[in-house]
Amino acid sequence: WQRQLLARQPNNAQGWRQLAALQQLSGSHDKSLATLRAAYQKGLRFNESELDNLVLLAGAADQPWQGAKLLAGMLDQGLLPRTSAREERLGLLWWQARERSKSAQVFRELAQRSGSAKHWLHLAQLELEQARWQAGLDALAKAERAGAERSKVRAWRQWAESELSYQREKHVASAG
């Protein structure tokens, strides 16, 4: 019945929201996301919390890449103000989408602004996942200075240093 209502009144924003809410309640996060995206593309406008919800729906629908693209676009276009929470969400969505370099860039900027141990640890983990050992070690040092848990930093540092040492030995062996 909700779709019939939309067919008769396609510019009724409330109808689109209701259909998306019903789809979300029934567990069809992907359909709810598609409904809201269709409404948005039709030119219907949403408030800030609805735009945030659209991004969250992408994550709930197991579409982190879509969520990251949506959020990045909304931030770049000024549709949503840049906040630390949104930047962190963007970094996590890129990470879930396996776009580690984009995620690392977001967390690097966020960590530099916030000085948060959590953000430095996220950056360190991303750098280490990409076998960027020295960059990971640098981020770990900053995380430790920012108050990160020493045992976690120590374990990651030992692993990164052993990998870096192995890479150097391998390089020396191949050069000789």
Question: Language model features by range: what are they?
Answer:
Residues W1-G176:
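Alpha-solenoid helical repeat scaffolds
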